[in-house]
Amino acid sequence: ADPGQQNKPDAWKNLSFDELKEAVHKYTYDVLYRLKIMDCAPDMVQIGNEIRSGMLFPDGAVPQYRQLAALVNEGIRAVRELLPETKVMIHLDQGGRYNCIMPWFDSMFNAGMLPIDAIGLSFYSFWHGTFMDLKDTMSRLIKLYNLPVYIVETAHPWRHCKGDHISKELMETAGLDAGSAEQKKSLEIIMQIAAEVSKDTGKTGVYYWEPVGVPGKGMGTWFENMGMFDEHGRALPGWDAIRDFDPKNPPIKELDKYIESLYEYEETPEVEDFMKLLMIHGNLISNPEFKDGFNNWQIETSLEEGQYTLGKDGVFISSDANFDYSISQTVDIEYTGEYIAAVDYRGTNTTGVEVELFMDVEDESGVHTYTSDIFPDDIRFVTHLLKPVRLQKNARVTVGLRMHTPPVFAKIKKISLVVI
């Protein structure tokens, strides 16, 4: 399960809500009982996995917080009944984004969620904000809820992926590039952050997902570069970071200053060239920066109107539930030539986020679609380009942005179409 995948098991698909609650309680109790009789009772139990969008859809999908709280409570009760000494954790993604985490916990406690013993966060630097965002989020959560906070999922690629799961473009938002030394440094930073912010509670931890993932046939793209062993099964330097870490003698001096130095950006030559073309030839999109509202734009979405609004930075989209969103404009091409589409986009990222810039072309030869995946960056607006497309005179072209995503926020500043 992750924020985009929280469906019920097939065996539970037709249960009533009361039956579903009973099934959660029984399943949790039975699994823990088997562990207990084998003398393997856990010290801590996490109810659900990355449940910021909910769990057991559709019954427990956010924003149905009361129903979600009722389901979570059945898991908590099962733990308390069988293993009263075992701690209970709730685990969310977006570890570097306090404004995603705090409202969720407030909503759940207000909806009747039972007391818990710890907060667990996922933090992947290429999805979940900067390292400083992580430090700020952990500090504020500890202070607000008086609970220890753990990093229960993290990883960093030890090489660039042969597939496209963790691309070079995505790693541009991570502060550190892919590499075995960078994996070690990422772990040092995260462990030092956790230790520093948890001095008063004295309780924290960092868990790597998944250290024993070794590249191999049928293992999937995550294991191409996210484990802590290389393709020959040799341990990577990241293990040294774990073995040698001492909170009393941390590896990084002046941590905040070091983190700040990691995030320096320059526009790519391709974007610089595009900006020059935009100034020379102009934008074929009407109302490209939404100064005239949504005039000339077509929108298709599962969101309510209040969840996508206009502000000084263009379109702002925010949802606490999974959603689809598409915004586009159709242009008739007057001259044959090569054209580039672009979008200035800023937004949060996590597991299951799908955002793409697209161009649908209708001409004498038929209908053609061109797309470019966007890897969101919530630190700044990034200009994303579609590779040049040759368009014929009288072609009808639709340019826009599509989103299919778990709960995130997004900003669309400008959409462009320029002839080369």
Regions found by a protein language model. Give the residues of each.
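Feature marks short, surface-exposed loop/turn motifs that line or immediately flank catalytic pockets
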Residues: 1-2, 51-55, 96, 125-127, ...
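Aromatic-rich peripheral "rim/lid" segments of glycoside hydrolase catalytic domains that contact
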Residues: 2, 63, 136, 140, ...
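A cross-domain feature marking catalytic cores of carbohydrate-active enzymes
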Residues: 1, 47-49, 90-94, 121-123, ...
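Active-site cleft segment of glycoside hydrolase catalytic domains centered on the general acid/base Glu
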Residues: 3-110, 114-116, 128-138, 144, ...
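Glycoside hydrolase catalytic-domain groove-lining segments
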Residues: 85-87, 100-172, 188-196, 200-202
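Extracellular and organelle-lumenal recognition/adhesion modules and their flexible linkers in secreted
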Residues: 255-420
